[in-house]
Regions:
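Conserved PLP-enzyme active-site core in the AAT-like
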Residues: 4-9, 30-31, 67-70, 80-298, ...
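Short, glycine-/Ser/Thr-/acidic-enriched flexible segments
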Residues: 26, 161, 216-217, 232-234, ...
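Conserved N-terminal alpha-helix of the aminotransferase class I/II PLP-enzyme fold
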Residues: 36-79
């Protein structure tokens, strides 16, 4: 039998380099090798209570608000998930309507279910060239706000998992014309605003509620995050109440100390930490732009911390058609772990925890792989040449029932090839990034079936299937 602690210790002592979260990258020098078991306590005298902060924790949260340029900030020890749940439920009435980006994290969908909300989806524009889902445009939001007058809140993701950034300032302006709040899932942008190389923090761009996953890109432990509230449109008291209900009643002081250390470091050592990191990152990106075949891809408005490397339309010298999953395996042979693989690309997440040695290893490995790749137009007969079909493009599906209604229906398990035309009773996610491709209550199409089957064949992780290669659907075919 394997034991978790021993397995983690062995991995931590190995030479595998992490181009994935958490953002501290196991860099013990940066983390100052603190946070051992001997500081794991409960709410004893002198250490305050997160759920009724009046002393130390109240001061620390106020300090975090100052550092992240927010009016009000709350520590989260259950990750951005509890922040998104509390924000959405605190800004909506039961049964209300929500305008949300289709590429929202599954926690937003869970909030929709819990509050019996009626979602209206904004679909990001998809780039055929890069296979990236693009930004959310203000015109899309304006059109839907005009069409649905009862929308209670708008929720978008910026930056996306791949680093695509939306114009928060313009979106906030149009949303506020309707006197409703804008929630920005900026989980992947906790580093925003700390260096001119990166976009501005959404707190400074008019967002009413902003959620930051500190652990994703900054030096902080997994599960640590912040929820910020600004302006007059978000119901602060209701959000606070949901935080009390949904967040652990025994918040870890180790996690809260990690948040404090992270905030303190970004406040007191910002220039030293960020200048060193950005210089290292810029050098790596410049070198990766020189690749002959593999492409360093990005969007017009982009977070440069994400290194997205595409092998679209490429073969290796053995004639094997490449995809993101295969590329990820090739990089793993160099003891480099990527954050995720998509149909045609991999994502290397970077942050101030990265080292020059780590960046050099990534660049050198990719350059070596690049030498053994052929760039050519693939024919329609090429096996596995289905890059378009295995992209993360959001496919619109008919919403026959709300997710709450679907959750109360009787269902049966059917094979994927029998699911077309049926009503799904469960979520189907590609994980990471945890974005639902199918939501309960939606009618399944042959296109989405083919897409999921292809992902499964290629070894991607599909969560939500009730059984192997089966899907739970409504009992009576419509």
């Amino acid at each position: 039998m394997e034991y978790l602690y021993e397995k983690l210790t062995a991995y931590g002592n190995s030479d595998y380099y992490a181009f994935h979260m958490p953002g501290h990258k196991r860099n013990m020098e940066l983390m100052r090798a603190r946070l051992p078991y001997n500081i794991d306590i409960t709410e004893i005298d002198g250490f305050d209570d997160l759920h009724h902060a009046e002393g130390l924790l109240k001061e620390l949260q106020e300090n975090a608000a100052r550092v992240f340029q927010a009016e009000e900030t709350h520590y989260l020890v259950n990750g951005s998930t509890v922040g998104l749940l509390s924000a959405v439920m605190g800004c909506t009435e039961r049964g209300g309507r929500i305008l949300m980006a289709r590429n929202c994290h599954k926690s937003v969908y869970n909030a929709v279910y819990m509050n019996e909300l009626r979602p209206v989806y904004i679909y990001p524009e998809f780039s055929e060239e890069t296979d990236l889902n693009g930004e959310i445009h203000v015109d899309q939001i304006k059109k839907l706000l005009e069409e649905y007058e009862d929308i209670q809140v708008v929720v978008i993701v910026s930056p996306t998992y791949e680093g695509v950034v939306s114009d928060i300032e313009a979106i906030a302006e149009i949303v506020h014309e309707y006197k409703i709040p804008l929630i920005v899932d900026e989980a992947h942008g906790a580093h925003f605003g700390f260096h001119s190389y990166f976009p501005q923090n959404a707190n400074t761009q008019g967002a009413d509620v902003v959620i930051h996953s500190l652990h994703k890109t900054l030096p902080s432990l997994t599960q640590t995050a912040l929820l910020h509230i600004n302006g007059r449109y978000a119901d602060r008291e209701r959000i606070r109440n949901y935080l009390h209900m949904l967040q652990s009643s025994s918040p870890s002081y180790i996690l809260m100390a990690s948040i404090d250390e992270c905030v303190r470091g970004m406040d007191e050592c910002r220039e030293e930490i960020m200048d060193t990191y950005v210089e290292c990152l810029q050098q790596a990106r410049e070198r990766l732009k020189q690749l002959k075949n593999i492409k360093l891809i990005e969007a017009e408005h982009y977070d440069q911390s994400k290194i997205v490397l595409s092998v679209k339309n490429l073969k290796n010298t053995d004639g094997e058609v490449l995809n993101g999953k295969r590329f990820q395996e090739m990089l793993r042979s160099y003891h480099l772990e990527m954050e995720m693989a998509s149909g045609s690309y991999v994502i290397a997440m970077t942050g101030p925890g990265d080292t020059q040695e780590g960046m050099d290893r990534l660049v050198q490995a990719v350059m070596e792989i690049d030498k053994n790749i052929l760039c050519e137009e693939l024919s329609g007969n090429d096996e596995d040449h289905t890059i378009k079909n295995i992209s993360y493009e959001m496919i619109p599906l008919e919403q026959a029932y709300s997710s709450f209604e679907a959750g109360r229906m009787e269902g049966e398990s059917v094979k994927w090839n029998e699911a077309s035309g049926r009503i799904s009773l469960e979520y189907v996610y590609l994980y990471p990034p945890g974005i639902p491709m199918i939501v309960p209550g939606e009618r399944i199409t042959s296109t989405i079936v083919q897409k999921m089957v292809k992902y499964k064949e290629m070894g991607f992780s599909i969560e939500g299937l009730s059984q192997e290669n089966c899907l739970l659907v409504a009992g009576n075919p419509e």
